[in-house]
């Protein structure tokens, strides 16, 4: 039901209606922004997009509704927020709208304020707001969400099934203010710390995923799964490659407040990333890792994994090998037969198709230069579908996945924020360009090569093509202090981004982690009360991890050893002739915020995660024969270990000497 019919009308309200291209579509909400050509850690970038400073996000944007008849309404202006002309203290920027299950309210992120005078330096934060009274003749009301972390940036919210709000924040892990901001594992720039869950009425705040390089764009699908993009970047610090002291990288003794700053840049895991690393082994290949993968979890943070356990062996076009001295270990360059024929490195801005549950649209885009815009793709991944049966389907032509200075005729420009609608229409924000963006104006009068407009897409041959924009364009004159320069946009056509359909949706059943039958049987045989164990874990902020047989591995992963046996045991899995590797221990690493920059005398704010042997848990049996932070693998290949809850973790299987044999490539929790 449209908003015209769903909401009682009031004739005495203030509303702003603008002419729009009258294409019959469901009601949608979207945001506008002044064109902002910079694309490194700015509001529409692939990472570092959470900052609210003037260099990261221009002021002057708004929150709009496009009603089904094409009428446009500026919700923020009608509610008394934002302005045209000089922005000053009333200037706003808006992002990330999400519609409630009932369709009668919207949560979004907004920053309020900009300098009122030149050189005025203030701190600004993205905060979460709700808007109600969405009818065409109603005056909308905007309120700030209660009990959110007001000292930090809160973005990308979504309504949970139980009225909790799941969102992205840069609040530091464990609330450790002295580690703020968390720095990513690539550029060591400020990033968010992952997904959080807030109960606004009580203030109960839970860190769902401690993400060392950040989480992005959560949604809840029709099956009740939280679906999001995670930046997976588990590698050694490139700002410390070969002990490069230009960045002044050093470690703290721990992440505790007051911990000693050490004259050390030691890194332990994973393996080296460059030839010049003094700790490298001649038999080990250099390692780097950089993917934005689709992930899933339950609303309480349990059962977190890549969607349907898909990974780079199903998605990537190239995977390097780990060891040089084993003919069975080889790099992957597309030589294996697999279902998925469209390789993607990054999968951004995921939206489920309301017409085909379990079908997910997203954007395959480069990391830099295009404001996270690129090719529209989709994958079918309902919960019961095996990862190796999932195929990525090209919606727009593959040429649109990246920039090209001499494009083919198939390169029809870049898309972002794909939105499949309940009437079967596909819309997205589209820019007619094939190049990386750059400022073609000046610092005082920025101009972008990109002109993001909301457009419907239609199938033309094998691929979808953009049609006429669904608005006639929204223009605005804006100025604000940077704070050094007066930045001006004169009658500029605003970008139209992040469209969401306003409709009622069936509330999915809330998912909970289910204890598998084999583990349940073990607990029963051992006389362990599962409820008591769960209470113990909760009280001690712990999790319990298990494996049934560590010698069994993914058949597609020929980049690490497949022939494994448990040291001193007959338990083994042999996939081919050749070298057999013994494994004796599982060495667990926890992500500690101990890496800082600027040197001991000019230390910069913020910390990067480094993998450190498990040390914050004392409940595991001792394993003096194994490496630090390890547990022994049982003769049948099984293992169990207590680990810290809500803390980034990774691991490796080692031999008796503590040398890595098989390494996990992702941060888990």
Regions found by a protein language model. Give the residues of each.
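N-terminal secretory signal peptides that target proteins for export/translocation
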Residues: 1-3
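Bacterial N-terminal signal peptides
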Residues: 6-19
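Extended surface/linker regions that mediate inter-domain or inter-protein docking
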Residues: 25-68, 76-136, 141-150, 155-173, ...
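Beta-propeller blade signature
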Residues: 61-68, 122-136, 181-202, 242-274, ...
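Catalytic cores of eukaryotic secretory-pathway lumenal/extracellular enzymes that build
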Residues: 93, 101, 107-116, 124-132, ...
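Beta-propeller domains
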Residues: 207-243, 259-386
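Eukaryote-specific, cytoplasm-facing alpha-helical/coiled-coil scaffolding segments in long proteins
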Residues: 251-257, 317-326, 402, 525-526
